[in-house]
Every structure is written in C-alpha cells, then in structure tokens.
Amino acid sequence: MTTACLMSTYQPLALSFTRGLGTRLWDQSGREYLDAVAGVAVTNVGHSHPMLVDAIRDQAGLLLHTSNLYSIDWQQRLAQKLTRLAGMDRVFFNNSGAEANETALKLARLHGWHKYIEQPLVVVMENAFHGRTLGTLAASDGPAVRLSYSDLPGDYIKVPFGDLLAFDKVCVTHGHRIAAVLVEPIQGEGGAQVAPAGYLKALRERCTRRDWLLMLDEIQTGMGRTGKWFAFQHEGIVPDVMTLAKGLGNGVPIGACLARGKAAELFTPGSHGSTFGGNPLACRVGCTVIDIIEQQALVENAGVRGQHLLGRLQEVLGGHPQVMQVRGRGLMIGIELREAIPELTRIAAEQHGLLINVTRGKVIRLLPPLVLEAAEVEQIVQGLAASLDSASYRALERSA
C-alpha cells in the first residue's frame, strides 16, 4: 500500500477495508473485524444499513446539489427533526464538525458585538478539541495546537475542564469581555473525560445570569451516543447553541449548528454561508439516520449496552497493571493506561480482529456503533484484555 501521493497528515495502519455491515468490517483478504471505533463516532447506525443505502441510491438518482440560492425540501425536513429533538429554534447546515464550531464561534462574536463588547472573549476548556481550522484550533488545547501553528486567533480564555472555582475566577477578571462559553459535555480527543455531575447545569446558570451564550460541542456525543439524543439532556438543561456532525451523516459529510432564542436571530442574509451545506443528499441522509435511530431504539440501546460495556471493562480491566481508570457514558468509553503502548491498536487488529482508537497517547477510546449487541460487548472486553496482555508481554521481552 503506497501513500506517496498523499500529504503526510496521518500514520494509518497497513489495513484497508473493502466492505462493512453493522458493526463489522472486512479487509482486502476477507478477514472480519469488530469495529469499536465507528469511524471515530460516525457510523452510529452501523455500516451499510439497508435503509440508508436505499436513501442514498434514490437521492443520488434524483438530485445531489442545487445550492442555497433555492429552497431545499430535505433541508427543511432535517431542521424540523433536529429542532424537535433538541428543543432548539433554528439550524445552519454545513459540512463538518469544524465548520459547525466555526459557525458557533461567529455567533459568539456577533452576540458580543450586540452587547457592545469590542473584542469579545469565549471561555474554552483545557484539553478540549473543536476542529482543525485556525479558529477552532485556537479554541482547542493540546499537541495539535502547541506544535503545529502559531499566531492563532487569540479571543479565547482557557480554564480547567470541570473546575467551577477556576471558571468563577475567570468570570471575575474577564467577565466584562466574555460573550460565550464553549464546552464538550464529554471531552473526546481529551480522553473521554466526562463533565462532573452538575457542571453543565452550573455553567448554564452562570451563562443565563450574565447573558453569555452556552455553546455545547456535541459532535462526538450527539445523535444518541451517550444514551440520550444529546449529552446535555443528562443534565436537564438546554444550551443556547449546539454543534453536531459525525453521527448525523453516518459517513456522509454534514455538520449542523443549532441555536435558540436570541442566538438563533443573530445571522442575517449574507452574514454566513456554505456552498455544499444542507445539500439534498446530506440532509436526506440525516433524516434517514434519525428515522433509523428512532425505529430501532438505538438511543436506548446505547445506554444499555454502554452500561454493560463499562461495567464489564471495570470488572475485567480494573485490576490490570497497565490500567489506571475506566470511564465514560453510553457508548463513549475511555480506558486510561499508565503509559503509552504504541503497538496496541495494531496488536488488537492483527491478533484479535478488534478495531480500537488511542487518544492523548495513552487513553483507549471505544466508540462502537449504536447497533452493538450484547455478545459483542463481551467480544470487545475479551479482545481488549488479550491485546493489553500481548502488548505488555512484548514490552517486557524488549526490556529483558
């Protein structure tokens, strides 16, 4: 396999897939794998779902693109479904999570300017990740920001995730310039870190009191992954702005920025736009994904299977010498290791037919499709335990 013609932005495994079905993928030699990554929280309804395949085929034969110069029926339908599920008022469609977050950041600036703040600030979290555009990188934290680019937009102030005392200190020193707060309910790239109970509700109260926009990045957590349609619903709150992507399209590129109240009224014609955003194909796919999730009760399945998986991982790996902590919510689970094991993803795939992801160097991130079955929970647990044992044994051999 050659990558000579591709820019060097990834270091992929020497593994290529030719087809998928449900939670399974098959490589070029016909070997089967259990997919516990789901394209990084994307293929929530599984690979090659027949309803989705039919919708894509049908729409491709009818109409792919017209632009937002004209009304798009499927765009209206998807907006109605999303606002109903989320308790929001309006939607702007684009093509990715980064674009959705850029839209949210524009809303934050507009909100600040409407409050006569010359240089509005957005409060963001340490270890956050919101995308790879310059604006969203500046709002993020971690190696991608520190090592790659300088002179990023500086209208952000970072606070430790989950630390209300630190947040309140920032409110005292910078409150007159703050326009919005941007936070992930569960930090995905940050290592599947779940916001402490009551944290989002406390942010909601503070934002309401100070007329700041509470903006939630639900790009990984949204569309049922945590056992609710959206992770904020675990806290019984509603944000002012929410961003979606990934699972909304199940592999077809789509992003969405939802807003309510005054945040939904900030844009005017010409103030933002997207050539491909909200095209008929992507929006029909989004509608079909929602229909599948509702018809197959996949939100509920994510909650049940996620609780089962988390419990079994804690039982089996809780005492493993390489494991520090097992955490998560629904089917978004992180296993933090004591040290990095560079070969772990390769060992899991090659020896145990299990696809996993590692973030922050030493946090195994499990994001299986929401169609996961009970027997597959045990397959993930046993495959992961065996992979850790194999990797640990190899490390001991090398050090001997």
Swiss-Prot record:
GO molecular function: identical protein binding; N2-acetyl-L-ornithine:2-oxoglutarate 5-aminotransferase activity; pyridoxal phosphate binding
EC identifiers of the protein: 2.6.1.11
Species assigned in the record: Pseudomonas syringae pv. tomato (strain ATCC BAA-871 / DC3000)
Domain of life: Bacteria
Family, per entry: Belongs to the class-III pyridoxal-phosphate-dependent aminotransferase family. ArgD subfamily.
Cofactor(s) demanded: pyridoxal 5'-phosphate
Listed GO biological process terms: L-arginine biosynthetic process
Cofactor binding notes: Binds 1 pyridoxal phosphate per subunit.
Protein name: Acetylornithine aminotransferase 2
Binding site for pyridoxal 5'-phosphate: 97-98, 129, 217-220, 275
Further facts: May also have succinyldiaminopimelate aminotransferase activity, thus carrying out the corresponding step in lysine biosynthesis.
Subunit structure, interactors included: Homodimer.
InterPro entries to which the protein is assigned, alphabetical: AcOrn/SuccOrn_fam, Aminotrans_3, Aminotrans_3_PPA_site, Class-III_PLP-dep_AT, PyrdxlP-dep_Trfase, PyrdxlP-dep_Trfase_major, PyrdxlP-dep_Trfase_small
Sequence positions bearing N6-(pyridoxal phosphate)lysine: 246
Protein residues bound to N(2)-acetyl-L-ornithine: 132, 274
